[in-house]
Regions:
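N-terminal loops that bind phosphate or other acidic moieties
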Residues: 1-46, 50-191
Length: 191
């Protein structure tokens, strides 16, 4: 599954880019198609993303629900991450338990911090300085929610600043926590 083909920066015209309004839903939909085809190992190629949703869209496409303080569903976009109060996982596709997922990307990409995805890549995706900080706060909050919703997969990972967690707008963190995906460099996957 190639991130750039499903949610790539080049798919959004330069004057319309807004990483707070884009989603990785298409990536999750492609994972679902791979599951339908009987895949036992799925490799997500990361790079050139137009998103900053922490993988929220992909998880929603695979059956998760994002709920606000009133229990209403929240659209899985970067600007909404701070509004999410709970990730409901009971509807996650059960086939995910039997598949190996590899997220192949730049292991230097971190989810948050000075080298985090919103600060490093937000401006090239169209984010204003204010939006960069709002996305950063949303991603910090999102990592906490991921750890609560997926404690088994998240327990041994540093979702905020672990290597590769910022791959493709934070897709690395979302899939590592939500699917137990292994984060690795593209080079390692090819060899």
């Amino acid at each position: 599954v190639e991130m750039a083909a499903a949610a790539g920066l080049r798919l959004v015209p330069a004057g319309m880019r807004d990483p707070g309004a884009t989603t990785t839903t298409g990536v999750g939909e492609l994972i679902s198609v791979a599951l339908d085809g009987g895949a036992r190992r799925i490799i997500i190629g990361c790079g050139d993303s137009g998103t900053c949703d922490g993988g929220a869209g992909a998880l929603v496409a695979l059956g998760a629900r994002l709920l606000d303080a009133d229990g209403h569903e929240v659209d899985p976009i970067g600007s909404n991450l701070a509004r999410v109060r709970r990730i409901e996982t009971s509807g996650m596709d059960p086939r995910l338990r039997d598949v190996e997922v590899l997220v192949a990307g730049n292991m230097h990409n971190l989810l948050t911090g000075e080298r985090g995805v919103s600060r490093v890549f937000g401006p090239q995706k169209g984010a204003s300085p204010e939006q960069v900080e709002a996305l950063e706060a949303g991603l910090v909050h999102w990592a906490e929610l991921l750890a609560e919703a997926f404690p088994a997969q998240a327990a041994h990972r540093d979702l905020l600043t672990g290597p590769g967690t910022g791959a493709s707008g934070g897709l690395g963190a979302g899939l590592a926590a939500g699917l137990g995906a292994r984060l690795c460099s593209r080079f390692d996957v090819l060899m």
